[in-house]
């Protein structure tokens, strides 16, 4: 599913400079299939258009990472094997450019987990919290996403100094 800050911003009808595109998959069989396609055919095996690669993909148990060149600019491309939480299937109609986005609950959970991992890294400029604020989740999605994140990381969710 299309996730990360870029998906959040686009889903809210906003725009910002983004130098990365993130996709998340939690289903083991689906990730195995994606890995095999990329190993056999490169990233081109996943797309309907030819890509200009900035670097060849690296594939491991955590994800598939590469960069693609768009108008001469390298854009980081990641398919993250999200093994911490089970991602819910997004509803039809939640697509951006034909790709379904994470559910609001999973957007909240993934951003809370990312913030907990990166809060001390000043180079991130607390972007995960900014993304959460941009998405303006309703109370149901916020509570459900927080519950998913707390189930994984415990009470450190919501208590990091940057929160």
Predicted regions and their residues:
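Compositionally biased terminal segments of proteins
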Residues: 1-163
């Amino acid at each position: 599913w299309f996730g990360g800050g870029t998906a959040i911003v686009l889903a809210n009808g906003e725009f910002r400079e983004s130098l990365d595109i993130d996709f998340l998959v939690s289903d083991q069989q689906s990730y195995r299939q994606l890995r095999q396609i990329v190993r056999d055919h490169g990233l081109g095996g996943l797309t309907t258009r030819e890509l200009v690669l900035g670097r060849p993909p690296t594939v491991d148990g955590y994800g598939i990472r590469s960069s693609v060149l768009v108008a001469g600019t390298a854009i980081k491309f990641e398919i993250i094997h999200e093994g911490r939480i089970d991602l819910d299937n997004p509803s039809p109609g939640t697509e951006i450019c034909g790709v379904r986005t994470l559910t609001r609950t999973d957007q909240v959970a993934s951003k809370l987990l990312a913030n907990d991992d990166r809060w001390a890294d000043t180079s991130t400029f607390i972007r995960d919290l900014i993304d959460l604020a941009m998405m303006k989740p309703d109370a149901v999605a916020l509570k459900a996403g927080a519950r998913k994140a707390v189930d994984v990381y415990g009470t450190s969710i919501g208590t990091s100094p940057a929160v």
